[in-house]
Amino acid sequence: MKSIFNLSKGILSVALISVAFASCSEDTMDNINKDKDHTTSVPAKFILADVITATAFSNIGGDFNTYYSTYVEHMVGVDNQLANAEKRNGEPSASSTFNNVWGNLYSTLKNARIAINISSNEVTGNYTTKGIGEVLAAINAGLIADSFGDTPFSQAALPELANGQPQFLTPELDKQEAIYTAIMEYLDAAITDLPKGDKSDEIGEYDFIYKGDGEAWLKLAYGLKARYTMRLLARSSSKDADLQKILEYVDKSYTSIEEQAAFSIYSATNLNPLFDFQWSRDGLAASKSYADKLIERNDPRLRRIFCIGQGKLTENENAVSIQVTGADDPRFLMADNGTAESVKYEYNTPIFVYS
């Protein structure tokens, strides 16, 4: 009997030890694939460097530029998907047309909101950095509202997660009007925060537009206030008062082109996305309807804003520098809106793509 009891004790001990080892092994396995070198939090200035780049390169400089320029007849699409867009052949209504920029906008807005939250710590007091985040949030929210109308906003691109997942997997649509209200709130907050400065960890060189100059960002904020007040004039209950506000905002904004919010870090190897697209594909041609308006009004810009197509140049000419001299120029060749042939390097090129 005693031997049976001892045997039972032995079996129980082995079982307990096995369970303990299994538990330890499970804990070890749970932690073995955790990347301990991957940071879980970063200063807001690093996040805003990405937000500024994404806003300029992907959101403002991306698909909106190319597609919208054909829809409003500033340019004519003559190649591939832009030729389809020009002829309204699937591209305007296809759900995939703006997939890339849609994802980029919401990702950028979320990152701007994260930077705002990080900078809101009263101990660190990074008010200028917070104000920059608020201006960038307003810009991206404006692109969303202008482009998509009623769309997810208050329940989308939120900085806080719920159990590692977005708080709202099927966010509700916000009215476009509500998004414009939020834009103004962001700008008002920025106007309050920007002049206060940063107590620590200034954004400095990570601000690729103004190098952390709060006064410059303040002028941008007032310029955006003027823009969106103008955009809402048709719905204004007091147009005269809003027109006066616009003048006041403009007075507090830029006084020269040198102050504009320019993302000027492009180079021969890091190309402006619109220029890169045109240079590699020649998918956009000069618009006949646009040129006709300039001719009708005897607008002198006709001699400044169109370049000769690359296929029409001589060996000694440079595509970027040879401008059309007017409607009587023998190489004046505009693309017909909606019916242009899908050919490259023939039509005149709008100078805007070389900016």
Provide a role label for each language-model segment.
Residues 1-22:
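Sec-dependent bacterial lipoprotein signal peptides
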Residues 24-81, 92, 96, 103-106, ...:
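Membrane-proximal, proline-rich intrinsically disordered regions
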Residues 25-26, 150, 184-197, 214, ...:
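Aromatic-residue-lined binding/catalytic grooves and analogous aromatic/hydrophobic interfacial grooves
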Residues 45, 80-151, 165-197, 342-354:
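Conserved, well-structured interaction surfaces
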Residues 147-185, 201-210, 235-249:
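Short coil/linker segments at helix-helix boundaries
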Residues 240-355:
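Hydrophobic-face positions in mid-chain alpha helices that act as interaction patches
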